[in-house]
Amino acid sequence: MARRELTQQEQEQFDKVLTETMTKPLDYVRHDANARCDEALRRATAEHGMGFLGSWWVLVELLCSKSEHEYDVRDATGWNILALDMSTCGRLWTADECRDFCEQLAGYGLIERELYDMGRIVNDRICREVEKYARAVAGKSLGGWKPNALSGNAKRNA
């Protein structure tokens, strides 16, 4: 069954809802039940212990809870903010610890190396999940219209 094309007005509404939804913090973090079996996470956990895995999930929650789903760490203030946000359960992080942790994450491919080198902490999988969710919300705003496959998130790579 072929999908009908959107009218210009419908496309504008879809794009508006899509953009609004993609830039909002998420209330819920969807992840696979076997996420711990991810090769990069297994390698990192084997080398650094379960604390590393727990810290990774704290960062995932933080990324999901931020509008735009990324951290700007181009300067000392950005690193200090991340350190404060990573501090949980009585464990205080320093900016240097955050830098070391994120460098390791980039090395494992858990955050995007190229964007990290530009001072942005971004996880591509989170971006894809946010876009998938946003497309579903935007489609529902048009009475259940279903969008085609994901187009990628060019905005993140701009």
Residues covered by each model-derived region:
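Short helix->loop/beta-hairpin flanking segments within DNA-binding domains
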Residues: E47-G78
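Alpha-helix C-capping/helix-to-loop hinge sites
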Residues: A44, L62-K66, D85, C89
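Surface-exposed beta-strand edges and their flanking turn/coil or helix-capping segments
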Residues: R43-A44, V58, H69, A134-A138
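Winged-helix/helix-turn-helix nucleic-acid-interaction surface
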Residues: M1-A40, V73-I81, S87-A158
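Short, mixed-charge amphipathic alpha-helical segments
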Residues: C37-M50
